[in-house]
C-alpha cells in the first residue's frame, strides 16, 4: 500500500447563522465553515414546517383553463 495518499482528517467548527456551533471532524481542509441553516433552526427539525395546500392550486388552474377547448380544423 502507498503511504500518505489520504487527506488529513482534522477538527472542523461549523457555525450556523442562528449562532449554533457544531464541532466535528472533516477532510475539507478548512478549520471553520459557516452554515445558513442547521438542525437547531431548520423548520423541518423545529416542527415549524408549513404544508403547502396544492389542492387549491390545482382547482385554480382547472378553473382558469376550463373554458378552453381544443378545436381541430380539418
UniProtKB/Swiss-Prot annotation:
MF terms in GO: metal ion binding; rRNA binding; structural constituent of ribosome
Alphabetically ordered keywords of this record: Metal-binding, Ribonucleoprotein, Ribosomal protein, RNA-binding, rRNA-binding, Zinc
Entry's transmembrane regions: none
InterPro entries, A to Z: Ribosomal_bL28/bL31-like_sf, Ribosomal_bL31, Ribosomal_bL31_A, Ribosomal_bL31_sf
Any coiled-coil regions, as ranges: none
Entry-linked Gene3D superfamilies: Ribosomal protein L31
Cofactor: record remark: Binds 1 zinc ion per subunit.
Keyword presence, Membrane: no
GO BP: translation
Recorded superkingdom: Bacteria
Residues binding Zn(2+): 16, 18, 38, 41
Heme among keywords: no
Cellular component GO terms held in the UniProt record: ribonucleoprotein complex; ribosome
Cofactor needs: Zn(2+)
Function as written in the Swiss-Prot or TrEMBL entry: Binds the 23S rRNA.
Protein family (similarity comment): Belongs to the bacterial ribosomal protein bL31 family. Type A subfamily.
Xref: NCBIfam families: L31, PRK00019.1, PRK00528.1
Classification via PANTHER family: 50S RIBOSOMAL PROTEIN L31, CHLOROPLASTIC, LARGE RIBOSOMAL SUBUNIT PROTEIN BL31A
Subunit structure: Part of the 50S ribosomal subunit.
Name under which the protein is recorded: Large ribosomal subunit protein bL31
Organism: Acinetobacter baumannii (strain ATCC 17978 / DSM 105126 / CIP 53.77 / LMG 1025 / NCDC KC755 / 5377)
Phylogenetic classification of the source organism: Bacteria, Pseudomonadati, Pseudomonadota, Gammaproteobacteria, Moraxellales
Amino acid at each position: 500500500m502507498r503511504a500518505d495518499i489520504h487527506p488529513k482528517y482534522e477538527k472542523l467548527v461549523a457555525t450556523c447563522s442562528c449562532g449554533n456551533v457544531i464541532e466535528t471532524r472533516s477532510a475539507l481542509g478548512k478549520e471553520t465553515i459557516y452554515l445558513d441553516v442547521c438542525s437547531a433552526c431548520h423548520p423541518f427539525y423545529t416542527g415549524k414546517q408549513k404544508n403547502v395546500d396544492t389542492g387549491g392550486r390545482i382547482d385554480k388552474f382547472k378553473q382558469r383553463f376550463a373554458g378552453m377547448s381544443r378545436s381541430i380544423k380539418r
